[in-house]
From Swiss-Prot:
Family classification: Belongs to the TVP23 family.
InterPro entries given in the database record: TVP23-like
Membrane topology: Multi-pass membrane protein
Glycosylation sites: N34, N95, N108, N200
Coiled coil: none
Gene name in the database record: tvp23
TM ranges: 41-61, 62-82, 137-157, 161-181
Name assigned to this protein: Golgi apparatus membrane protein tvp23
Subcellular localization(s) per the UniProt record: Golgi apparatus membrane
Disulfide bond positions: none
One annotated Gene Ontology cellular component of this protein: Golgi membrane
Keyword set, alphabetical order: Glycoprotein, Golgi apparatus, Membrane, Transmembrane, Transmembrane helix
Length: 219
């Protein structure tokens, strides 16, 4: 038979265990949510494979750089690995990622007189857009050059000018698509606005002429 003291101890222990179980359940649930955010991002993407490779090469280059600072003595090997990753990233983003994720594409051609000509292409603005693809593309496009700039500042502080040269190459390769797609996006918005204005003007003129015709000949 329980005494009053035993009952109180039992209740206190039960409450303590209940709180611990609840906290553990919350912790596990939070860990599961955090673990599922990245896969969920790819699940919500319209082009998960393109999104994966869009992030893979540029992230791999930064990871290789940071690990190489501590775990390798072969700077030339590291330079080749990072340069290869960023070169593949440059081609992939230019020809695949931008077209699939945000409906934009750019290229640069040389004219007859040797002049550099930028050509921007964009998908139909009425095409359904995926918010995950859009946000990830634009955030990553500006974030990664910024990360390389920070790594460059660290190299300057540590007087590692050989590493700084590698960072300069990385900034150059990652900034090409950043600058090109920024111009491509502005050009697309300008053309869409012009086409919309022309369409509205044409519609206004058509309505005006129709009303004038009806009023003149029909009354």
């Amino acid at each position: 038979m329980f005494t009053s003291l035993d009952r109180n101890l039992y209740v206190d222990n039960h409450i303590t265990l209940t709180k611990m179980d609840y906290q553990n359940t919350e912790t596990i649930a939070e860990q599961e949510r955090n673990a599922s955010r990245l896969p969920q991002m790819f699940q919500m993407s319209s082009h998960p494979v393109a999104l994966f490779f869009f992030l893979l090469f540029r992230t791999g280059a930064i990871v290789a750089y940071i690990l190489g600072m501590f775990f390798t003595s072969s700077f030339m090997l590291l330079f080749i690995v990072i340069f290869t990753l960023l070169a593949v990233d440059l081609w992939t983003v230019k020809n695949v990622s931008g077209r699939l994720l945000v409906g934009l594409r750019w290229r640069n051609e040389t004219g007859v007189d040797g002049e550099s000509i930028w050509i921007f292409e964009s998908a139909d603005p009425s095409r359904p857009r995926n918010a995950v693809d859009q946000k990830t593309f634009w955030y990553a496009l500006y974030l990664y050059p910024f990360i390389w700039i920070i790594l460059g500042i660290v190299a300057i502080i540590r007087f590692e000018f050989l590493w700084l040269a590698l960072v300069a190459v990385a900034i150059g390769l990652t900034s090409v698509n950043t600058a090109a797609y920024s111009r491509c996006d502005k050009d697309a918005k300008r053309r869409w606005a012009t086409e919309l204005a022309d369409s509205n003007s044409s519609g206004f003129v058509s309505r005006f002429l129709s009303r004038a015709f009806i009023k003149r000949f029909i009354g």
